[in-house]
Amino acid sequence: WDGGTVTKEPTETETGTKTFTCTRCSETKTETIPAGSCPSAGFTDVPGEGNWAHAGIDYCVANGLMSGVGDNLFAPKMTTTRAQIVQILYNLEGEPKVSGTMPFTDLTQNWYKDAVLWAYQTGVVSGTSATTFAPDLPVTREQIAVILMGYAEKVLGVTRTWTPADLSTFPDAGSVSGWAKDALADAVALGLISGASNGGQTYLEPQGSATREQVATILMEFCKNVKK
């Protein structure tokens, strides 16, 4: 059996469910998670259950995709970096063993080196040059879409069976980079990115930095709608 995936997050009053899959026959079994065992309860800065970001944070914490930043903090408003997003996907993939030559010379911390090598070798993320990865560079919302859809195609083998969204319905569609349009249209169609409301209109904010709470929510939707 695999390590299991939380398919329903528990709340203070309702039980949750964790589903395990047999690695040989694909049979599944479930386990009840007691009520009151909110995965993010140990963090002092996570918004309450009524907040839009709570479920995504719970999901990512419960499934080992994201952890805190220390001192009982999750830092939901903190910008997500390139190193962090590849580490999250590496966690999602089960931290497979990697070997080979690392082409990047700017990786200063050990915690993300295996994830960066995995992302580079699979083609999920490339460097900012032949020898630099820029691990501390913030990722934008459109970059998250490109990275996730690239992971879906190159690692999961997902093929498009959906109709891409029409980005022209968003007032800031013109600010989407040409290289990100297809991936962002797919991400919107799959419910991974829904846009941000402002003044009665919904904006994509493709150049906006992706916060940890946004990434957690996007990842939850990705796991439920794409990586099934």
Where are these regions (language model features)?
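Phosphate/pyrophosphate-binding loop motifs in nucleotide- or prenyl diphosphate-using proteins
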Residues: G64, G123, G191
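Feature responds to low-complexity, polar/acidic, surface-exposed segments characteristic
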Residues: A35-H54, S67-D114, V125-E142, G150-K181, ...
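Alpha-helical membrane segments in multi-pass integral membrane proteins
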Residues: S177-L190, A216
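Alpha-helix C-terminal capping/helix-coil junction sites
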Residues: V61, Y120-Q121, V188
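Extracellular/lumenal glycan-associated surfaces
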Residues: T17-E27, Q87-N91, R141, V146-G150, ...
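Extracellular modular ligand-binding repeats in secreted and cell-surface proteins
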Residues: W1-C38
